[in-house]
UniProtKB/Swiss-Prot annotation:
Interacts with GRF1. It comes from the Eukaryota. The keyword Lyase does not apply. Predominantly expressed in shoot tips containing the shoot apical meristem (SAM) and flower buds. Also expressed in mature flowers. Residues 181-195 have a biased composition (Basic and acidic residues). The keyword Acetylation does not apply. Residues 166-195 are annotated as: Disordered. It comes from Arabidopsis thaliana (Mouse-ear cress). The gene is GIF2. It holds the Pfam family SSXT. This is GRF1-interacting factor 2. Transcription coactivator that plays a role in the regulation of cell expansion in leaf and cotyledons tissues. Component of a network formed by miR396, the GRFs and their interacting factors (GIFs) acting in the regulation of meristem function, at least partially through the control of cell proliferation. GIFs are involved in the positive regulation of cell proliferation of lateral organs in a functionally redundant manner. Coiled coil: none annotated.
Length: 195
């Protein structure tokens, strides 16, 4: 049922984006439409209807190209770093009756916003290189732990903390095991002699 109504729900996309006449509501409409198209594609793939999938994929491709053209035509947004620091500087410039901004605003007005926004930048755009490989995360964490604890690497483990805790135990555990083995052996001989 939905497959018959779906093509009517997705109008044809204009080929040339208007210069600056596009609104966020129109962009949201295309994003919602794209979501419906993706759901229809998935549904038709599950049903084995490849012809319908191809039609929906073509519409989705047109929508994506249109949105990309709009994004390319728009001026780049201001970077998030300078905006908060200028807002903080403007707040500090205005006199407050009896109120004083926290000292960290005065000491590092630009370092604070950069520290807040820098890690979020790659995540907002879905960078495939950052935070993708768990082994790289473990290695970075392991190196950080080694730097703090002065431990030399012996190999990859599940996580850096576990590795850092295992190495000292290995040395201690070996000594304890040897002592325990001698004691157990003596006790064992005594028990065997008693039988």
């Amino acid at each position: 049922m939905q497959q018959q109504q779906s093509p009517q729900m997705f109008p044809m996309v204009p080929s040339i984006p208007p210069a600056n006449n596009i609104t966020t509501e129109q962009i949201q409409k295309y994003l919602d439409e794209n979501k419906k198209l993706i759901m229809a594609i998935m549904e038709n793939q599950n049903l084995g209807k490849l012809a319908e999938c191809a039609q929906y994929q073509a519409l989705l491709q047109k929508n994506l190209m249109y949105l990309a053209a709009i994004a390319d035509a728009q001026p780049p947004p201001p970077t998030p770093g300078p905006s908060p620091s200028t807002a903080v500087a403007a707040q500090m410039a205005t006199p407050h009756s009896g109120m004083q901004p926290p000292s960290y605003f005065m000491q590092h007005p630009q370092a604070s916003p950069a520290g807040i926004f820098a890690p979020r930048g790659p995540l907002q755009f879905g960078s495939p290189l950052q935070f993708q490989d768990p082994q790289q995360q473990q290695q970075i964490h392991q190196q950080a732990m080694q730097g703090h604890m002065g431990i030399r690497p012996m190999g990859m483990t599940n996580n850096g903390m576990q590795h850092a805790m295992q190495q000292p135990e290995t040395g201690l555990g070996g000594n304890v095991g040897l002592r325990g083995g001698k004691q157990d052996g003596a006790d064992g001989q005594g028990k065997d002699d008693g039988k």
